[in-house]
Amino acid sequence: MTLSGILAIFLVVLALVACAWPLGGYIYRTFVGERVRPDAVMVPVERAIYRLIGVNPEVEMDWKAYLRAMMVSNLVMALFAYAVFRLQGVLPLNPAHIPAMPPYLAFNTAASFITNTNWQNYAGEQSLSYLSQMIGITFLQFTSAATGLAAAMAFLRGLSRQKTDALGNFWVDLVKAHTRLLLPIAAILAVLLLALGVPETLSGPAVVHTLAGSMQTIARGPVATLEAIKQLGTNGGGFFNANSAHPFENPNAWTCILEIMGMGLIPTALVFTAGHFLRSRRLAIVLCTLLGAILLAGAYIVYAYEAAGNPILAHALGIHGPNMEGKEVRFGLPLTSLFVAATTAYTTGAVNAMHDSLMPLSGMVPLLFMMFNLIFGGKGVGLLNILMFLIIAVFISGLMVGRTPEIFGKKIEAREMKLATAAMLVHPFVILVPTAIAMALPSARASMGNPGLHGFTEVLYAFTSAAANNGSAFAGLNGNTPFYNISIGLVMLFGRYVSIIAMLAIAGSLAGKARIPETSGTLKVDTFAFGYVFVAVFIIVGALTFFPYLALGPIGEQLQLG
């Protein structure tokens, strides 16, 4: 580790938070209907869209209607994408004549992108046509991000309103997420990436003569537009199999910094948006400070262990130096380490290095971040997970002092706790049970690229990534088999929608309650003292749940290294 590397990581995170602060206020004003500068341009466009789809923007929905609209729209979009993948061989914009995607793989891919996971059991440049990349992949990267954002807005309305069943209008939230946030920022990011060397073309693969005198086919396509929403929407699915390690997706250190800031911008801003909704900017500062500190700690741990290198090489061969296996030298260790931490903290899943090549305890950092699933988290759903653990922390704190738990003036009763507990427990359930099944099946074990503890970590990482809707992988695992295509697809769906359903039900319950006046005995949630309790709760829950599996994986592997 070097001082310049440590400082570089800190400055990138600081710049990210500085950009997220004003964006959080803008998101709040947009979704509560206050006047904002883009109104003059966007309001007529949005009205035209509402007329086209037959929606009255003035009519709000209760939590059941909101959820119904969300689930139906997501089902239709997933079926559309599945059809595109299955029919791409006969559809236009396929200059490489790529055949149709097999049914199991098409199911996995559709489930992956509708859930904002972007797990890829295929190589994008070899398995998808340009049309599939644009109207299948890129389309879902926008709509899945907008869906998560809409769910977060509905939950914040439930916390901030009283004596009502209205949580907003899903269609209005979905449209605004596109017109006011995702499309404008993605366009700016795409132009910046273009200027820095990321290609954007509908021309077919380029065939070139190499210096060695042979012919080489170089894949290309509409990369910049996909890359922008891939990061901004915390999607992570790459145009190329190498993802953001590919020079066409991430040519240099400047694009690497842009992509890190792109993936973290809106999730960080949503913490400040929550502060505006709940009239508690101090709470937003407390949460952002603590979660940011955990993000930095994770990045520094990765940096430290990768900089220390592999002790086996040092002891056996006398080779000292950092572990550069699976890394791009154009980024260096500091940006690589921050990317590893950020892509799992924000549940993006893009990679600029091969996580399978990380040192064991370095690889445990992204695993832990996905197991916690709330170090900022993904677009919208990450905020839901933060607020879910906030409710659980308030409940535990209330029990310790003998008071009825309440949060933001609303009593937390049995219904809310049952739903929050269900949302909390589904995450480890859909990680640990499929992992155990996979390790019990010889056909599933045959997909492991490595034996022993590292092979187990590959399987654990795959299901953790799917459950957290992250999408990154220990790429030594061959996931393109019927078992993994189906099981990982189902885990992604359960990991995404069960928690959303539970949290919207909580929002509907809290919205109907009257706000209780604050007294001297009211638990203050906007203090660092409570913030430490909040952090302790999710760390203890994570440690108790996942430690045995981590001991069989990265911890055991580190002990083997000596």
Swiss-Prot record:
Membrane topology classification: Multi-pass membrane protein
Name of the featured protein: Potassium-transporting ATPase potassium-binding subunit
Gene Ontology cellular component terms for the protein in this record: plasma membrane
Subunit structure of this chain's protein: The system is composed of three essential subunits: KdpA, KdpB and KdpC.
Purpose: Part of the high-affinity ATP-driven potassium transport (or Kdp) system, which catalyzes the hydrolysis of ATP coupled with the electrogenic transport of potassium into the cytoplasm. This subunit binds the extracellular potassium ions and delivers the ions to the membrane domain of KdpB through an intramembrane tunnel.
Main subcellular location of this protein, as a coarse class: membrane
Natural source organism: Alicyclobacillus acidocaldarius subsp. acidocaldarius (strain ATCC 27009 / DSM 446 / BCRC 14685 / JCM 5260 / KCTC 1825 / NBRC 15652 / NCIMB 11725 / NRRL B-14509 / 104-IA) (Bacillus acidocaldarius)
Segments passing through the bilayer: 5-25, 65-85, 135-155, 181-201, 257-277, 283-303, 331-351, 358-378, 381-401, 422-442, 486-506, 528-548
GO molecular function: P-type potassium transmembrane transporter activity; potassium ion binding
HAMAP family: KdpA
Keywords from the named record: Cell membrane, Ion transport, Membrane, Potassium, Potassium transport, Transmembrane, Transmembrane helix, Transport
InterPro entries: KdpA
Top-rank lineage group of the source organism: Bacteria
Subcellular location: Cell membrane
Similarity section: Belongs to the KdpA family.
